[in-house]
Amino acid sequence: MIFATDLDRTIIHSSKFVDNASQVKCIEILDDKEISYMSHLSIELINKIKNNPSIQLIPITTRSYAQFKRVQPVQNLPYAVVANGGIILHNGEPLPEWEKHVDSICRRLEDQYTNILKLLNQYKTHLTKEPVLIDDIFFFTKISDDKTIINYIDEAMTRE
């Protein structure tokens, strides 16, 4: 059986979602700062799944490869899917076949990156994070006003 799970806000949480510090353990540190936590129960259950030979745990996340490697409880697994599906890890290393496939797609679309950034910058006042290219695969940003973006998408879809 496969047990696939997202990471952020599913089995791991930032400090703003931690109500009781005694019920969690820090599982990610960046620049000497604790940034992510898991409940003791979640850690126990993940370890049970990892140690059960009939279940294969596969973490799936939007996190970059570097961000994923900081999350200790989900390391040393046969498979993981990171970078929004752009990287498939096998025993902690990117699968070369998938990497080659994704790279060929990204190279074909590379000339569109400027247009994508231009589009994102039209909504700069609604962004809380500067757009960034993750692992040379996809753009990531955060928005403050999702209604504006949803309206834009609705308008774009009706024009098609």
Q: Which residues are covered by each model-predicted region?
A:
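A signal for specific C-terminal beta-sheet/loop modules enriched in small/flexible residues
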Residues: F3, V24-I29, P94-T114, I150-E160
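Acidic-enriched, low-complexity/disordered segments with a strong bias for Aspartate over Glutamate
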Residues: D6-D8, D19, D31-D32, D103, ...
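Phenylalanine-focused residue identity feature
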Residues: F3, F17, F68, F138-F140
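Conserved acidic, metal-coordinating active-site core of Asp-based
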Residues: Q122-E160
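Active-site neighborhood of HAD-like aspartate-dependent phosphohydrolases
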Residues: M1-F3, L7-Q56
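Active-site phosphate-binding/coordination module
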Residues: M38-T128
